């Protein structure tokens, strides 16, 4: 599903030597990439999410493919339907144009022009997986940090991506909520044939839920 071979990304106007990435994983499930702050985790997550070149201008060398397509070649409409990235700050990922959690989770699937019945089914499944049903009619602006983080993950799940990238996406959750979500996401990935890549600083508790780690 994701392959990087001697892959380097050099941002526009960068004065630092680029990181070199080697990564290959093609099976469904959950894997993790660990690294300290400043190690290039978030940049790698954004590259795997297909942000180059539209949102990550610069130059790339080496080989990189996402779901069989070279990095930078996947059309935006296909990319949004197959790859989702959830980052550490949930508030920055809300659309800002909805009045309830239900509308927020529906926003992505509606932009795929799906049938209303399919959209509602995706909303129900995503809210159930993330334990967000009680938040369904709440305004996104009234949510706590942990609640917002679960809603943003629900939005990504509702898109039913083949590749889901979670970049420190559990930072505001309680240990109990984090453990619940990790278990459910692992099961979801295996059931749907999708790949989840976690980007985290600390091994615990994420390593216990992953098939492989780097």
Region roles according to the model:
Residues 160:
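Conserved catalytic motifs of ABC-family nucleotide-binding domains
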Residues 89, 97-111:
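Q-loop/switch helix immediately C-terminal to the Walker
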Residues 153:
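Hydrophobic anchor residue at the start of the ABC signature
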Residues 106, 117-135:
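Conserved ABC ATPase "signature" region
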Residues 57-59, 69-84, 111:
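ABC ATPase NBD coupling module
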Residues 139-143, 147:
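Conserved ABC ATPase signature
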Residues 164-168:
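Catalytic Walker B motif of ABC-type/P-loop ATPase nucleotide-binding domains
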């Amino acid at each position: 599903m994701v392959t990087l071979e001697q892959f380097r990304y050099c941002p526009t106007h960068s004065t630092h030597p680029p990181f070199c990435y080697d990564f290959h994983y093609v099976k469904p499930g959950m894997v993790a990439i660990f690294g300290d702050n400043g190690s290039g985790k978030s940049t790698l997550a954004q590259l795997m999410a297909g942000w180059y070149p539209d949102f990550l201008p610069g130059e790339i060398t080496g080989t990189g493919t996402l779901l069989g397509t070279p990095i930078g070649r996947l059309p935006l409409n296909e990319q949004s339907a197959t790859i989702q990235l959830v980052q550490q700050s949930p508030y920055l990922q809300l659309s800002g144009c909805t009045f309830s959690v239900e509308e927020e989770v529906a926003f992505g699937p509606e932009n795929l022009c799906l049938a209303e019945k399919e959209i509602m089914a995706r909303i129900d499944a995503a809210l159930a997986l993330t334990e967000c049903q009680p938040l369904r009619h709440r305004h996104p602006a009234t949510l706590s940090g942990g609640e917002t983080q679960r809603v943003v993950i629900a939005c990504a799940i509702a898109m039913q991506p083949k590749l889901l990238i979670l970049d420190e996406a559990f930072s505001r959750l309680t240990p109990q909520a984090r453990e619940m979500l990790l278990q459910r996401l692992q099961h979801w990935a295996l059931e749907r044939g999708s790949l989840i890549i976690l980007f985290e600083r600390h091994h615990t508790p994420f390593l216990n839920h992953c098939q492989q780690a780097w």
